[in-house]
A protein has these predicted regions:
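Phosphodiester-processing cores and adjacent nucleic acid-binding clamps
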Residues: 1-106
């Protein structure tokens, strides 16, 4: 049975991702994976490199992003009562329109 990781951080997820795209995709192929997602934290910087390298090694690239969902503005500095004030949400593009929506969402968050 094929297995695909749908929540993967690369070196573009600062302070969280340690996988380098140039090493990640050949290793995934070696492990028998036929597809793999990229879901870096709040950025889409690595998707072009990821896409090209995935195609090069014969893996279907799944482009995505892990975004933060938070009430209010990112400039709010109100402290919660010990609980997190934001949530993580993984978004994956199904097609070119979805990819464009990811780019728009990522850009709008800045």
């Amino acid at each position: 049975m094929a297995f695909t990781h749908l929540h993967v951080h690369t070196e573009y997820s600062l302070l969280d991702g340690s996988s380098k795209i140039k090493e990640l995709l050949p290793r995934a192929k070696e492990l028998g994976m036929d597809s793999l997602a990229i879901t870096d934290h709040g950025v889409m910087y690595g998707v072009i490199d990821f896409y090209k390298k995935a195609k090069e090694v014969g893996i279907k690239p799944i482009l995505g992003c892990e975004i933060y969902v938070a009430p209010g503005s990112r400039f709010d500095r109100e402290q919660g009562r010990g609980e997190d004030r934001y949530y993580h949400l993984v978004l994956l593009a199904e097609n070119n329109q979805g990819y464009n929506c990811l780019l728009y969402t990522s850009d709008a968050a800045d």
